[in-house]
Amino acid sequence: VADTSTPNATSGNWALEARGLGKRYRRGWALRDCSFRIPAGRICGLVGPNGAGKSTLLGLATRQVQPTTGDLRVFGVPVDDPAVLPQVAFLGQDKPLFKRFTVAETLRMGAELNPGWDAAAAHRIVRAGNVPMGAKVGTLSGGQRTRVAFALAFGKRPDLLLLDEPMSDLDPLARDEMSTLLMAEAVERGTTVVMSSHMLTELEDMCDYLLVVSEGRIRMAGDADALVPAHTLVTGVSRDGSLPPELAGHTVVESRLQGRQFQAMVRPRGPLPADWERAEPSLEEVLLAHLRSPDAPPLYTQGARVDAEGTQAA
């Protein structure tokens, strides 16, 4: 899918915009040559295996990590500009809350630290889960603590909410409740959400935008509704026990040969042979194919990429 977005799009249209972004540690590059854009008002799934660079990317967006190369902007403003701080909220997997504080004290702390605090929204989120305001945070269940953490995040009224595996420790019922809460609050406020998660089905239900990272590089970026139809799952019979030469005319993400039958995830660059069976893959199948094949050519949908100099990239 080529990038055909208009050159006069304003930077404010992009919640996050990276150009040539990279981070190197002693052991090597955690992220390298990352250029992408996430539109404002979207719920973006950040996908990748352990060690892919997801947490590093979120760390760069929250100024917890300093980049080695490149540039990262939040709503068109450099991420290290103090003006960005009130616009961004971050919720990590460990949800660092003061266990000796009561829920009420925790929300009061949020009000004192954030000038634009929305007490009504924070209290609404807590009350919806029947969380006792007088209970100490350390006595709450995992689902209740997560709800309090979400209340702190949304009470800040951020324009950009960054979530690092926020629901990994929840049971299925609590996870469903938090997912519903997240989507409702994001839609109501127009908040841009970037959420890292290993749960592909969860992302499929919630996210309308995707950023796929593998081995420190961007593998896919763009609208979920455009990324999936760009792929076709083909199955056919091998004539000589090897992959058919016709595959070379298409972008092959992943292929496998079992006996005399082959199967491949491709991005067609023209008509496919009539004797091949064709099916549209699920989002999960597309993501897994790209994660298993980090050397496959990357894919960006319209507007999702700029090059390191900030110009449109095809």
Model regions: which residues?
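Short, conserved post-Walker A segment of ABC-type ATPase nucleotide-binding domains
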Residues: 44, 55-64
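The feature captures the beta-strand-to-loop junction immediately N-terminal to the Walker
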Residues: 47-49
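Conserved ABC transporter NBD signature motif
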Residues: 62, 69-84
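ABC-family P-loop ATPase nucleotide-binding domains
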Residues: 93-148
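Catalytic Walker B motif of ABC-type/P-loop ATPase nucleotide-binding domains
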Residues: 161-165, 170
